[in-house]
Amino acid sequence: MFERIISFAIQQRWLVLLAVFGMAGLGIFSYNRLPIDAVPDITNVQVQVNTSAPGYSPLETEQRATYPIEVVMAGLPGLEQTRSLSRYGLSQVTVIFKDGTDVYFARQLVNQRIQEAKDNLPEGVVPAMGPISTGLGEIYLWTVEAEEGARKADGTAYTPTDLREIQDWVVRPQLRNVPGVTEINTIGGFNKQYLVAPSLERLASYGLTLTDVVNALNKNNDNVGAGYIERRGEQYLVRAPGQVASEDDIRNIIVGTAQGQPIRIRDIGDVEIGKELRTGAATENGKEVVLGTVFMLIGENSRAVSKAVDEKVASINRTMPEGVKIVTVYDRTRLVDKAIATVKKNLLEGAVLVIVILFLFLGNIRAALITATIIPLAMLFTFTGMVNYKISANLMSLGALDFGIIIDGAVVIVENCVRRLAHAQEHHGRPLTRSERFHEVFAAAKEARRPLIFGQLIIMIVYLPIFALTGVEGKMFHPMAFTVVLALLGAMILSVTFVPAAVALFIGERVAEKENRLMLWAKRRYEPLLEKSLANTAVVLTFAAVSIVLCVAIAARLGSEFIPNLNEGDIAIQALRIPGTSLSQSVEMQKTIETTLKAKFPEIERVFARTGTAEIASDLMPPNISDGYIMLKPEKDWPEPKKTHAELLSAIQEEAGKIPGNNYEFSQPIQLRFNELISGVRSDVAVKIFGDDNNVLSETAKKVSAVLQGIPGAQEVKVEQTTGLPMLTVKIDREKAARYGLNMSDVQDAVATGVGGRDSGTFFQGDRRFDIVVRLPEAVRGEVEALRRLPIPLPKGVDARTTFIPLSEVATLEMAPGPNQISRENGKRRIVISANVRGRDIGSFVPEAEAAIQSQVKIPAGYWMTWGGTFEQLQSATTRLQVVVPVALLLVFVLLFAMFNNIKDGLLVFTGIPFALTGGILALWIRGIPMSITAAVGFIALCGVAVLNGLVMLSFIRSLREEGHSLDSAVRVGALTRLRPVLMTALVASLGFVPMAIATGTGAEVQRPLATVVIGGILSSTALTLLVLPVLYRLAHRKDEDAEDTREPVTQTHQPDQGRQPA
């Protein structure tokens, strides 16, 4: 089949070139559509169910809202896990499905179960699904701010309520229409409300209740349609508008009568534009702001959506009221562009180094250009495949591309073509005719097809273990393996079509094969080393064995981690205060943090934070926690450009630690989301304790936390805050209430309306709409003594008059701490102890911590402990790779056996793998890089290249033996003759990774372990292949040589017709 393809490519060379140009055009088109991101989206298929339960304590929220929803979700097709969180007035259930489940199908299933759950939920408690977004969907954040001295049309200054109104009714509707945006979340400022604040004394004097006020507002704020009438041939619609249109309309609503006189709302209280009882706030650089967040639709490209949002924001800014502006505070595009710039720089520099090596070794400019052309063509082919399979270009997907490996097949054919054309021209003593040239090109490509196919297949097979990874690790590394295989496949297709056609067209007259000075120098140095190796077999083999043993010992001492942390350039800081800290107090404390850090560190561009829970409760946080972001200036603008990111982080931690009342957890914006998606917590390591009793869980967690704090490397150890929320409990005495003829709900309604407020209609203002709320004045609802005097209406007597008793007659008010939050996982309560690991690897930290906990903490019967975080993924990936990698290596050996039809020679080539691993391990150890899945991918790639090194040399030695050379002659001549392709293989593969190994840009730390392993491994593999493999081959075949007749030694350098093996 390949012969027919090669023949067609040469005969129809212009057609082939035209097809290649077409493929390149499609690749360019695909490149412009290629999704670009910093890292792969590892979000599992999950659906959030958020339920608002106003006034419910965490325990009641769990009992009345969370549990019924969890129960109905059990048994869903493809269900993998449920996680839930119950806080004051809010419930969140996260339903996680198996990978591959369609997210829209999952949402449909969840929605069906929500309908079933509604029957078991209290009145007014309505669950709703979260946005169709991913855990990394928060791609763009902005603030709505008023400039200093800005005034509204009436001359008054802008208030937080005004800015929130602009955000909700001007900015948000426009941004929601941007393609790729699924939801806009808002936090900060106050939702505008029309507040009716009755006076208790006036209500009682008129014999009215809070319920009377609510009913009056509901009855006097509606429009009614009455069909139509026909009159004189025309049809008139009949309507009776009754909506309130101003504050005066509300004030004039009649609540009741007294002595024949109407009693209006203005007679019993005040009507004003009030503030909601908010659950969250936002701050920036020490002042309160309104903060908006874009949630990206799942499957969209973050860079494209961010750019579209940014353009829309610029458009909206031009239409904002004078003095009010939108300020972008976080844009994912900034990180994406920096990360992709690092990838581009590494790939371009690697390509340049590879091309230089080609020019130096091939000695023919046209041949080198044809070979180098494979690099952009293979990349364009890869881009087309990535677009079709919806793989984004990111640090991981492009992180393992090595152009030296990719062009190996093209080098096989081009070098063989050049050699055959040169020999044919030398034989004829004249330039070749076109038909002779085509014949030689066909023969050269035909000879090279076997090593080409086997070489490419071996490298593809060593990437198979990566496809066996599942879960988070699979989503991280599948794109990497897929792009490498795509690039290899594209290069292989081009090698048997474009390369023969291009060689036939552009390489013809005066072709000469000559060795350059570099190769002559290399041969002069290599020959005496080879002779010494062959003369000292025992020493060479002992040295090789000792090297392998030493590196195995070093490998055992290497630390381990899942993947290196990407330096995003910005810092995430979570400030935690004691449970029960009010929202207003928390905001003031957060302002102090922001102003202190901004003033102390000129490297900081801005600090902003979300305190509490936003309007869309995708991330439930109590008011005592602030989720902050420290946005840094570009390093070139730092006063001390030599200061490292780690040094700055350490200084910020130290300075923040001086501010009293706060505990901190430091991370990075994307990193904390990664951790949260992986294990449901934001830290690197999480210890989860499961059980039934909250008090037992809390006590056990404190003991575990104390142990963790003593483990070296543990930082920011904290226990999930499950207790300590101050509660004011109104304990109703049933007997006393019954004596007054009161139901429990009569007392509860009075308390709920007076303190919490009750929605009593909507105020329409054009497209805008605002709640009308009945609630007691702040001076009353904030005082415990005033609440004890809250009038409770008694059932009407014979005279139909309403009488009242104070709340204290039927209830007592008690202040005591209660549960702060209740977390559950798979239907069981749990508490989390979280920690970040710094200064050491996670792989060694967890076993040490686990042993310490087992020896020092006794877990009560019926309770159990598990570990979560990135360590869990490291274990999972390691376990799977330990099974799959040997299988892949076995397949490689099967291919080698098929190539040689000889187990002995297959095993000899296979020895290149341990030789390569020694260099990779040594390189990691020298650079102080722990073992990670990224480094493991490097070792996997290394196995393929190392096998090719041996294949290059051994195939040629075998061909010399078949032609009659003695064993010693074949080994010497073969090793010296194959020095060039072995060095080319090593240099192009290793130099292609050099830019990744030494890069310092954004994302370089993710690629560095892989590049370090490949470079170190190729250097050791090449050295050992050139010196050890000839010794091993002679040793393995000495008995065969003794059994054969002695042949005449061949002294001249042999130039066989067989094509060069893979380079």
Swiss-Prot record:
Cited InterPro entries: AcrB_DN_DC_subdom (IPR027463), Acrflvin-R (IPR001036), CusA-like (IPR004763)
Reported uses of this protein in biotechnology and industry: In the presence of 2 mM Cd(2+) or 4-10 mM Zn(2+) up to 99% of the metal is removed from the culture supernatant and is sequestered via bioprecipitation. Additionally Cu(2+), Co(2+), Ni(2+), Pb(2+), Y(3+) and Ge(4+) can also be removed from culture supernatants, although it is not clear which efflux system is responsible for all these substrates.
Location in the cell: Cell inner membrane
Coiled-coil portions: none
Bilayer topology: Multi-pass membrane protein
Alphabetized GO MF terms: monoatomic cation transmembrane transporter activity; xenobiotic transmembrane transporter activity
Positions of region (Disordered): 1040-1063
A GO CC annotation given for this chain: plasma membrane
Induction notes from the record: By zinc, cadmium and cobalt (zinc being the best and cobalt being the worst inducer).
A Pfam family matched in the record: ACR_tran
GO BP annotation list: response to cadmium ion
Highest taxon listed in the record's lineage: Bacteria
Family from the record: Belongs to the resistance-nodulation-cell division (RND) (TC 2.A.6) family.
Role this protein plays: Has a low cation transport activity for cobalt, it is essential for the expression of cobalt, zinc, and cadmium resistance. CzcA and CzcB together would act in zinc efflux nearly as effectively as the complete CZC efflux system (CzcABC).
Name assigned to this protein: Cobalt-zinc-cadmium resistance protein CzcA
Underlying gene: czcA
